[in-house]
């Protein structure tokens, strides 16, 4: 894509939740992108149903990528980074890219070698998710951004929700 990805510093988790809903509504209101052309990818599969519920509570229908079979549907597609592999959407939003979750912290009983392997896999899955948009990538965090974002700041246009 020719557009530089957006990194949105929402400052706290509640504002991040609000921004996600506002941004999806604004994207659809532009008339250029429908709900079905938006993917929201999360680090963990266990977070997907909560995100679909949160969007639904605000009138935005979501479809779990585990149930998506490629049939067009006017719903935001929501899934894990891992499930995003091989799919493309006009707009991809990666919320909750926080320290300790992307990648996860090293477990107390986890060897350095095991952690290095887990971290490598997490970085790879994050990279896959970041390469799914055709037109625009939006990455958000509420507080305490992931070290991966800090390492890649130059690749993003960094903004706050109020800038958009």
Positions of predicted regions on the chain:
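Helicase P-loop NTPase motor core
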Residues: 1-61, 67, 120
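Prokaryotic Sec-type signal peptides and long signal-anchor helices
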Residues: 23-26, 93, 160
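Short, contiguous strand/loop micro-motifs
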Residues: 38, 70, 112-114
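Alpha-helix capping/helix-boundary segments
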Residues: 46-47, 83, 144-145
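A short acidic (Asp/Glu
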Residues: 49-53, 89, 149-152
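Long, contiguous C-terminal modules that act as interaction/assembly or targeting platforms
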Residues: 52, 56-64, 78-79, 83-84, ...
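Conserved helicase core region in the C-terminal RecA-like lobe
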Residues: 63-101, 125-132, 138-142
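C-terminal accessory regions
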Residues: 97-164
């Amino acid at each position: 894509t020719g557009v530089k990805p957006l990194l949105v510093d929402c400052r706290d988790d509640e504002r991040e939740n609000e921004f996600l809903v506002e941004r999806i509504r604004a994207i659809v209101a532009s008339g250029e992108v429908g709900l079905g052309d938006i993917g929201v990818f999360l680090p963990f599969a266990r977070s997907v149903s909560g995100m679909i519920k949160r969007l639904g509570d605000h009138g935005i229908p979501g479809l779990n990528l585990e149930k998506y079979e490629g049939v067009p549907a006017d719903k935001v597609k929501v899934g894990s980074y891992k499930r995003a592999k091989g799919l493309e959407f006009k707009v991809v939003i990666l919320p909750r890219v926080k320290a300790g979750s992307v990648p996860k912290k090293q477990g107390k009983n986890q060897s350095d070698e095991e952690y290095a392997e887990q971290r490598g896999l997490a970085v790879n899955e994050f990279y896959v998710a970041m390469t799914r948009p055709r037109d625009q990538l939006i990455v958000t965090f509420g507080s305490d951004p992931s070290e991966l974002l800090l390492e890649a700041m130059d690749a993003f246009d960094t903004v706050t929700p109020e800038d958009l």
